[in-house]
Amino acid sequence: MAKIPLILSFCLLEAFLGAESTVFIENKEASTVLSRTRRGNSNRLEELIPGNLERECIEEKCSFEEAREVFENTEKTMEFWKIYIDGDQCNSNPCKNGAVCKDGVSSYECMCPPGYGGRNCEIDSTCATKNGGCEHFCRHDTPQKAVCSCASGYKLHEDGKSCKPAVPYPCGRITAPEMRGKVTRTENTIERWNITAHDEGDAHDEALDITEPPPPPTTSAAPAKIVPITKNDTRVVGGYDSVKGQLPWQVHLVDSRGLGFCGGSIINEKWVVTAAHCLEPGDNVTAVAGEYNTKEDDHTEQRRQVVKILPYPTYNRTRNKHHNDIALLELDQPLTFNSYVTPICIGSRDFTNNLLSNGPGTVSGWGSMLYRGRSAIVLQVLTVPFVDRVTCLKSTSTTILHSMFCAGYTAGGKDTCGGDSGGPYTNSIGETWFLTGVTSWGEECAKPGKYGIYTKVAKYVKWIRETTRLT
């Protein structure tokens, strides 16, 4: 009986092995059914095999030394390590103006193109854009480096860009207590500046016997606009009563009878600039600085006798009294500067040209408030837009030379007029005012379609500086 269970067991085993469905299959066939990723260091000692990037730094966190084993080159390892350790700092594109970004460990470096600087190459280090960031003057020390400087009476701030007063009453700065809290400047937003390599000498004289045809319309981009911020004072015909001390560089020229006939601007303690057609050598002229109300004693006036009248060397009244219409007046005694008697700033040639052509200007004087009307008693002030040369030439049959420019309103109603000649046309940058023009002539006053014509000061900068010994 004991043999029966044993025989039965063998029979069952044979039946199981002969079944159609088998449990075990060949190794190669099994690999197609079940697979797993083998580690880079499977079954071998890591120290005995060459470096593997997957094994060292992807499956596990690696050290710099382990990464170095993979690349076997320090420079390539560094490039990998900068991104591996803290991500690519250049992904956010921090570099500006076409600069190339180079990633670093927790940092980045911008490789700036020529003419740009700063951490992100955001600073245009040339004078072409935004005047090189300079508050006053910009010049090129090297072809791609802008160097800032300041007008007389100012010093360059530690930032190398802004200008701070170095004297109590620097040029072009309004300091009268009556002007505190009053906005008188235009917000300068000039983007592009045209600075030449040699921003110095005066322009060449023009031939008077050549009639200049209007140039063809230009297709270049229009100059950047400056949005003016002006005061809302009581309106006078064409202008406004100024605030006392608002125009401390304004001079009133009076004759031997004490009657005013022209204006002028203070250059320094001994010199005033005006229009050449206003007077002739030998005239008895008194320059009154600090004037405000011509019918009252303002207690701020300083009267000086004019001892020398110097028109521009090539000025010829007989041929054309408005060509090179600018003159310098030497005073018998120096003026004493204060909040009501302050010089106007004189910029370089290119600086003055850029400032002039990119925004509205401010004109002032005691001239007629209507064509052939009575003169103003209180000093008048008016903001007028600069007029492009094509429009200027089309407005008149009279020759407009390059020493002249137009300013005013096409609709008329606002303009300089008789008695304002010789007075200042000024533009501001920041809180500093610069002389950019001298009131010269016009066809009637404030007539629609006509503009005031001014002498372009930029042409005469070198002559003014040399004659007045202005530093």
Curated annotation (Swiss-Prot):
The gene is F9. This is Coagulation factor IX. Ca(2+) 6 binds at E75, E79. It comes from Gallus gallus. The lineage of its organism: Eukaryota, Metazoa, Chordata, Craniata, Vertebrata. It is an enzyme of class 3 (hydrolase). One of its GO terms (molecular function) is calcium ion binding. Ca(2+) 8 binds at E291, N293, E296, E301. The active site is at H277, D325, S421. The record marks R185, T186, R235, V236 as: Cleavage.
